[in-house]
Amino acid sequence: MSNEEQRSRTDGRQPVGTVVFDFDGTISLGDGPVRSYARHAFARLPAGLRERAVRTLDLYLGGAVTDDGRHWNDGYDVVSDMCAGHVPADGLQQAYLSSRDELARGLVHVDMPQGLPGFLDDLGSLGCVRVLLTNSPLHGVRETVGRFGLEGRFDLIVDGAGKPGRWGDHIAAFDRLSGRGRLLSIGDHWDNDIAPVLAAG
């Protein structure tokens, strides 16, 4: 695992297993981050296409069937699709990084699930290793964790995780960390967060 922040366990107990949390859409809730990304990305589109892109994203995030009839995994897929052929990959990456900077600065509104701090405390009391595993960069994640009052409640934070492709590496590392072959993954994206763990047994 790379790009990780780790807090050592100080109670001396043998961990009983690992509980892995995703970040966006799991402990950080709301459309603010993807709307921020869209605002920066769509600004690079011609005016007519920009209006259509904004309308399509609004429909998708509102749960309506889009006028294109497409199916996306999340709002980020919508933004990328609407920009295809008009905004190069480096332009989309810059838009994404700008949105994460706004998240880090507290300019994007997000919420956490009710009761999350207590839940993490309970997991720690049970001897679980609590991991935050995200494909997002640390910038934006770290600051949000702090604003949520979750500092010290994760034993390990791994950013730039490369899910789903690198799950095998992560599972092996978590098994070494906990000394157990028990892992629970909690996330909002089936392909990224759930299916690879089920497939690994």
Where are each of the predicted segments found?
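Short beta->alpha linker loops
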Residues: G32, G115, S136-P137, G162, ...
